[in-house]
Curated annotation (Swiss-Prot):
SMART domains: Copper-fist, Cu_FIST. GO terms for biological process: intracellular copper ion homeostasis; intracellular iron ion homeostasis; negative regulation of superoxide dismutase activity. The CRM-I motif (C-X-C-X3-C-X-C-X2-C-X2-H) and CRM-II motif (C-C-X3-C-X-C-X4-C-X-C-X3-C-C-X-C-C-X2-C-X-C) correspond to cystein-rich copper-binding domains. This is Copper-dependent transcription factor 1. A motif (CRM-I) lies at residues 348-362. The lineage of its organism: Eukaryota, Fungi, Dikarya, Basidiomycota, Agaricomycotina. PROSITE patterns: COPPER_FIST_2 (PS50073). It comes from Cryptococcus neoformans var. grubii serotype A (strain H99 / ATCC 208821 / CBS 10515 / FGSC 9487).
Length: 1048
C-alpha cells in the first residue's frame, strides 16, 4: 500500500481487485483511495464553528468559491513541463486532460483521472518543488521541514478545498467563473480577522506567491487574508537570504540590476544576481572541495556555496527552547546533487580578513553599488591579486563537485595586468626563457649564483666575510674539541670509525694557524726493518727506538704501528712507568692529545726441547704459557724489588720475575683480535691471584684484523732479537713461532729496568716457585691457592667451569693423523678425530661413583672460549710430596681405576672391580663385555662358569669396524708437567705419559706392538697408532681390567 501524507494510493488494477492494502506498484498511475462512507459537506472550519458552544452561524458550509480549484488543476503546471518535452504527444495529452471532464465513480472504483499519473515520480518532483520554494515565505526565514509536505503544497489552506482560501468570507453574490486569471479574487471581499483567517498557514501555494509578487496586489483582499509573516515574534533570528521577498529591497535594486548571462534556470521569477551579496567566496569553496593531498572531497557542506543551514530537530520545539533559554543549533547538511538552487559565490581569494574596498563578499566599507568603481584590481594589499568585487553565479542542476569547481573556475576573473612602474624582484615571469639556459644571460639579468655552504660542513664559526678555513675543516674554527672524548671513543668505536675520525681530526689544524699545519713528512723517518718471517704481510714503518729511553718505553713504542712524537730532550724519569711514551697515529695530526699506549707483551725464551713440538692440525692449541715447565731453566741471578706505578694503581712486585700487567687503554680495533687477560689481584701474602677467565669477545682467526697483529709481532721479535744476547735461547733454532690464536696475556712481561740493558729472559722456575709450587711437586702452605679450590669445595664446582689446556704433543707423535685428541682415555679407546668443538665428555652415568672425579664429571669447554692458569694439584700426604710414577707391575697403592682416590681400608681386588664395573652399551659388545655378562648370569643363577669366555671370531672384525669413538673425559693432569726426578729434557716428554698410565702385570719394555684385549687386536693396534703404541710402551697382551689410569 502506498501511503502519502496519511492518504492511501493504489493503482487501478489493485483497486478493482480489492487489493488496495497489498498494492506496491509505484510505477503505475496512482489513484487516491477514498474513505468509506458519505463524503463531508462542510469544511473543517465550519465544523469547528458548529461544534463551538452556542454557535449557530450556519448549518451549511458556504465557504470558498463556488467552483474551487481541484488538485488536478494544481498539477497541470507540473505536467506542462513534461508535455513540452513531447511536442506533439504532450500537447495533445494536455488538451485532452483539460477537455476531458472528471466522471464521478462509485465506491470501490478508481476515478477517471489518476492523482499521480506517473506514480512516485510526480511525488518526487513535488518534493523538489517544495525545496525550491524555501526562502520565499516568512521573509527570509527557512521553511520548516515538517511543513514542506505534499499535503501542505496541494492544500495550503486547512479547509482542504485546494484553491485560494475563501473561508470566513460572506458570499454576497455568486462568484463568476475564472475567465482570465483563475486566481483573481473579487474586489468586494469582506474583511478578515487580523489573525489571518481560519487557516493561519505559513505556507503559501505557488499561485499565492505569484499574486503577491505583483505591485497591484499588495492591498488586495488576498494579501489581507494571508498577510506576510513579518511579525517580530515569529522570527527567532533574522538571516540574510539572496532570495528575499522584501519588496522594498527588491524595488530599490531592480532599476540598476542586470541579468547575468550565466543563469540558465527555467524559473521565471528570479532575483537579480549581480546585486545580491554572496555569502561565501571562492577560497572557502576550494578549501572545502579539495583535500590537502589534491583529491576531491566526497561531499561539501551547504554553507560553502552560500545555502543556509537546516534547523535541527530541537528547534521545532520553540516554546521549550524559549523557556530553557537555549538557542537552537542549525545543522550544516551536505550539499545534495544534483543541486536545485541557484547560488552566487564571490571571487575573493583573500580570506575572511580581506580589506579590499568594494569586495563582493567582505564589504567592510559599505560602498553602495551605485558608487562602486573598480579598476580591475584591488591594489597591492590584495592577497588574491584579482577582482574581489566580482561574483560568480552557479546555476542549479550541478551533478557533482567536479562540475561545480569547473563552473566556478571558468568564471574567475583574470589577474590584473602588471604595472610598468613597479618591478617585483621575485617575479620570474618578467625574465626571458634564455635565463635558464645560459649562465651569461642570467648574469646579465642580475641573477648571481650564491656560493654553496661547503666550508666546515655548514657549521663554520668564523665571522662573516673572514673565513679562512680549508675545505677539510671540521667546523671548530679555533680550539679543536673533537678529541675531548678520545678515551671513550677508543673504547666504543671500531677500526673503520677511528680511521674516519682521524681524517676529520687532521682537518682541525687547518683553521688554527700556520704553526699547526705541519705534515706527516716531518714525523715519519721510515726505517723498515728486516722481517724474520717469510710472510706476505705488510709491515708499516716504525719509528726507531730512542737511545735515551728505558726498556719499557721501547716496548711501548713497538706495540702498535704508531709513531713517537720527536722530543728534543726527554725528561728524566724515576721509574719505568713514568716514562710512558705518547704515541700518535700516523693519520692523526701533531695536535692530537697524546694517549698512553698499551702494555707490551713480553719476550719469552724457548727451550731447545720445545722447538720441535708441532701441533697436529685440528688438535688442541698449546697451553696458556705455550710451553711445558722445566725446573732446569736458567735462573736469574739477583733479585730486584720495587714499586711500579701504573696510572693510579700501585702494586707490589714480590719475587725475582713476577709477571705484571699494567692496565692500559685499548681501542676497539685492538679488541678485535685481543683476548682480555685476567687481571692479577694481589693477595694478602703478596702473590697475584688469577681472576675468573675472560671470555673471547671476537674471533681470533679474522684475516683482516690479524694482519696488523702479525706484522707487529714480527717487528717486535725482529727488533728485540739483536738486544737479547744474554738469553738462554738456542740461536740455531728459530725464534718463538707467532700464533694468531695466542692470548696477549700468555707472555708474562720482563722485569723492566731503568738502564739501557737488554731484556733478561723469563725464568719459569722462579715464577713457579713464587706462586707456591715447590720442585718436589708440593704447593707451599704459606701461599694461597688461586687456581684450584680446596678439596672440601670440589663437589660444589659448577659443571661449566673451564679446564686447563692440554700439554704439547711430543715430537714422536707428529705422525698421528690430524684431529687426534691427546686425552688419556684416547690412549686406549679413541681412534676417531674429535669434532670441531673439541672432545665431548663421557657421561657420568657410565662411570661408578667411586671412580668419578669432579674434573671427569664436568663437560669439556673448548680451549678457544676459556683460559685459566694451569691447575696446581695437591697430592695426598702419604705420597711424601712427590708425584707418583709407576715403576712396577703392581698397581699404585691408594689409587683405583681412572685415578680416583680409594680408602685405605678398602681392598682393591679383581672380584670387587668386576662387580662394580658397568658395561658401556653405547658401543658394540666385545669379548670382555660378554665375559662380564656371562659371569653376572652365572652368579644370578647360582651356576659356575669359566672366568674367561672366548669371543666370537666371526663377529670380531665386524665389531672392530663398527666400533664408534668413545666419548672421552676432560684431562685431569696439569698443563705444565714438572719432573722432580729427571733433569734431562729429552726424557721429560717420554716420562710424561707414564705418570698417568699404569699397566698391571705388563712390563714397559715389552716388544709387542699395540694393546690387545684377550689376545685380539685392540684400538691402539690400528695402523695409525702403531708407532704411538711403541712410543708409549703399551705392548703385549693384557686384559680389560689390567689397565690402571690415574691422575695427580
Amino acid at each position: 500500500m502506498v501511503l502519502i501524507n496519511d492518504k492511501k494510493f493504489a493503482c487501478e488494477k489493485c483497486i478493482k481487485g480489492h487489493r488496495v492494502s497489498a498494492c506496491t506498484h509505484t510505477d503505475r498511475p496512482l489513484f487516491e483511495v477514498k474513505k468509506k462512507g458519505r463524503p463531508s459537506t462542510q469544511c473543517r472550519h465550519c465544523k469547528e464553528k458548529r461544534k463551538s458552544a452556542g454557535s449557530s452561524v450556519h448549518t451549511k458550509c458556504q465557504c470558498g468559491a463556488t467552483d474551487p480549484k481541484t488538485l488536478k488543476d494544481i498539477l497541470a503546471s507540473v505536467n506542462a513541463a513534461h508535455a513540452a518535452a513531447n511536442e506533439s504527444g504532450g500537447a495533445s495529452a494536455t488538451a485532452n486532460t483539460s477537455a476531458e471532464p472528471e466522471i464521478e465513480t462509485r465506491k470501490g472504483q478508481p476515478g477517471s483521472k489518476p492523482t499521480f499519473p506517473r506514480g512516485l515520480k510526480d511525488v518526487h518532483e513535488i518534493a523538489a518543488a517544495a525545496n525550491a520554494l524555501q526562502g520565499w515565505g516568512e521573509d527570509d526565514q527557512v521553511v520548516k521541514a515538517a511543513e514542506r509536505t505534499v499535503q501542505a503544497l496541494l492544500n495550503p489552506c486547512k479547509c482542504e478545498l485546494g484553491g485560494p482560501c475563501t473561508c470566513c468570507q460572506i458570499k454576497t453574490k455568486p462568484r463568476r467563473k475564472h475567465s482570465g486569471h483563475e486566481f483573481e479574487n473579487p474586489a468586494s471581499a469582506g474583511a478578515t480577522p487580523p489573525g489571518g483567517g481560519c487557516c493561519g498557514s505559513s505556507v503559501h501555494s505557488r499561485d499565492d506567491v505569484a499574486t503577491r509578487n505583483s505591485p497591484t496586489s499588495i492591498n488586495s483582499s488576498e494579501a489581507i487574508h494571508h498577510p506576510p509573516q513579518t511579525a517580530p515574534m515569529l522570527h527567532k533570528t533574522r538571516l540574510f537570504s539572496p532570495y528575499s521577498t522584501d519588496l522594498r529591497r527588491r524595488d530599490s535594486s531592480s532599476s540598476t540590476g542586470s541579468k547575468t548571462p550565466g543563469w540558465a534556470s527555467p524559473r521565471a521569477m528570479r532575483p537579480p544576481v549581480s546585486r545580491i551579496k554572496p555569502l561565501t567566496d571562492m577560497r572557502r569553496l576550494m578549501n572545502a572541495a579539495v583535500n590537502q593531498d589534491g583529491t576531491l572531497a566526497s561531499e561539501i557542506p551547504r554553507s560553502v556555496v552560500g545555502l543556509p543551514t537546516l534547523p535541527g530537530i530541537e528547534s521545532f520545539n520553540t516554546s521549550a527552547n524559549l523557556e530553557n533559554g537555549e538557542k537552537s543549533k542549525d545543522v550544516d547538511m551536505p550539499l545534495a546533487f544534483p543541486t536545485s538552487e541557484d547560488v552566487v559565490i564571490g571571487a575573493c581569494m583573500c580570506g575572511d580578513d580581506c580589506s579590499c574596498p568594494g569586495c563582493a563578499t567582505h564589504d567592510h566599507h559599505n560602498i553602495s553599488p551605485s558608487n562602486r568603481t573598480h579598476d580591475g584590481s584591488c591594489g597591492e594589499s590584495c592577497k588574491g591579486h584579482n577582482d574581489c568585487a566580482h561574483s560568480i553565479p552557479i546555476p542549479s542542476g550541478v551533478q557533482s563537485i567536479a562540475q561545480l569547481i569547473c563552473i566556478a573556475a571558468s568564471q574567475v576573473p583574470p589577474p590584473p595586468p602588471n604595472r610598468t612602474d613597479s618591478l617585483n624582484p621575485h617575479d620570474t615571469r618578467i625574465l626571458p626563457p634564455s635565463v635558464s639556459l645560459s649562465e651569461d644571460v642570467a648574469r646579465t639579468m642580475g641573477i648571481v649564483p650564491l656560493k654553496p655552504l661547503e666550508c666546515c660542513g655548514g657549521k663554520c664559526g668564523c665571522p662573516p666575510g673572514e673565513c679562512a678555513c680549508t675545505k677539510q675543516c671540521c667546523g671548530c674554527c679555533g680550539e679543536c674539541t673533537c678529541e675531548k672524548d678520545e678515551d671513550t671513543r677508543m673504547e666504543e668505536e671500531g677500526e673503520y670509525t677511528e680511521s674516519a675520525r682521524d681524517v676529520t681530526t687532521s682537518s682541525c689544524g687547518g683553521c688554527k694557524g700556520k704553526e699547526k699545519q705541519s705534515g706527516f713528512s716531518d714525523m715519519m723517518s721510515p726505517q723498515i726493518p728486516q722481517s724474520v718471517s717469510p710472510t706476505s704481510y705488510h709491515v708499516p714503518p716504525l719509528q726507531p727506538k730512542p737511545l735515551n729511553l728505558p726498556v719499557s718505553t721501547i716496548h711501548h713504542s713497538t706495540l702498535s704501528p704508531s709513531f713517537n712524537t720527536p722530543q728534543p730532550s726527554p725528561p728524566a724519569v724515576s721509574s719505568p712507568a713514568d716514562s710512558l711514551s705518547m704515541a700518535v697515529h700516523p693519520s692523526n695530526g701533531p695536535n692530537v692529545r697524546p694517549v698512553p699506549m698499551i702494555q707490551p707483551r713480553p719476550i719469552l725464551p724457548k727451550r731447545a726441547s720445545d722447538t720441535g713440538l708441532v701441533m697436529p692440525q685440528g688438535s688442541r692449541p698449546p697451553s696458556a704459557l705455550g710451553r711445558s715447565g722445566s725446573m732446569t731453566a736458567t735462573k736469574r741471578s739477583g733479585t730486584s724489588t720495587g714499586v711500579r706505578r701504573s696510572n693510579s694503581d700501585v702494586r707490589k712486585v714480590v719475587g725475582p720475575s713476577q709477571p705484571h700487567h699494567r692496565p692500559s687503554i685499548q681501542s676497539s680495533s685492538d679488541r678485535s683480535f685481543y683476548i682480555g687477560s685476567p687481571s692479577n689481584q694481589i693477595a694478602p701474602g703478596g702473590v697475584p691471584m688469577a681472576s675468573a677467565p675472560s671470555q673471547m669477545t671476537a674471533p681470533l682467526n679474522s684475516a683482516d684484523s690479524n694482519s696488523d697483529l702479525l706484522a707487529f709481532i714480527q717487528q717486535q721479535w725482529s727488533a728485540d732479537k739483536t738486544s737479547n744476547s744474554n738469553s738462554d735461547m738456542n740461536p740455531s733454532h728459530p725464534t718463538m713461532p707467532v700464533s694468531l690464536t695466542a692470548e696477549p696475556w700468555a707472555f708474562p712481561p720482563q722485569n723492566e729496568t731503568t738502564d739501557d740493558s737488554a731484556p733478561v729472559p723469563f725464568d719459569l722456575d722462579a715464577f713457579l716457585m713464587s706462586i707456591g709450587v715447590q720442585p718436589d711437586g708440593e704447593l707451599r702452605n704459606d701461599r694461597p691457592l688461586s687456581s684450584q679450590p680446596p678439596q672440601s669445595l670440589m663437589p660444589n664446582i659448577p659443571p661449566t667451569q673451564p679446564i686447563a689446556p692440554l700439554p704439547p704433543i711430543p715430537p714422536s707423535m707428529s705422525d698421528v693423523r690430524p684431529g687426534y685428541d691427546m686425552t688419556f682415555a684416547n690412549f686406549f679407546l679413541n681412534s676417531t678425530p674429535s669434532g670441531p668443538s673439541g672432545p665431548s665428555a663421557i657421561p657420568a652415568t657410565n662411570i661408578p661413583s667411586r671412580h668419578t672425579t669432579p674434573q671427569a664429571s664436568r663437560p669439556l669447554t673448548p680451549p678457544e672460549s676459556s683460559f685459566t692458569e694451569p691447575p696446581r694439584w695437591k697430592f695426598p700426604g702419604d705420597l711424601g710430596g712427590e708425584i707418583p710414577i709407576w715403576n712396577g707391575p703392581e698397581a699404585l697403592e691408594g689409587f683405583g681405576v681412572l685415578g680416583s682416590p680409594v680408602s685405605e681400608k678398602e681392598e682393591v681386588t679383581e672380584e670387587s672391580q668386576n662387580e662394580k664395573d658397568i658395561i658401556d652399551l653405547s658401543k658394540p659388545l666385545d669379548s670382555a663385555a660378554l665375559t662380564k655378562i656371562m659371569k653376572a648370569l652365572e652368579k644370578q643363577g647360582g651356576g659356575q662358569s669359566s672366568s674367561q669366555g672366548a669371543p666370537s671370531v666371526a663377529n670380531t672384525d665386524q665389531q672392530l669396524q663398527s666400533l664408534p669413538a668413545l666419548q672421552t673425559v676432560p684431562p685431569v693432569h696439569p698443563a705444565s708437567v714438572i719432573s722432580p726426578t729427571r733433569a734431562d729434557p729429552a726424557h721429560e716428554l717420554d716420562d710424561m705419559f707414564s705418570q698417568f698410565v699404569t699397566l698391571d702385570g705388563t712390563p714397559i719394555g715389552s716388544n709387542n706392538d699395540g694393546l690387545g684385549l684377550n689376545g685380539g687386536p685392540g684400538m691402539m693396534a690400528l695402523p695409525t697408532n702403531l708407532s704411538l703404541g711403541d712410543e708409549l710402551g703399551f705392548g703385549g697382551e693384557m686384559r680389560w681390567d689390567q689397565a690402571r689410569m690415574w691422575s695427580n
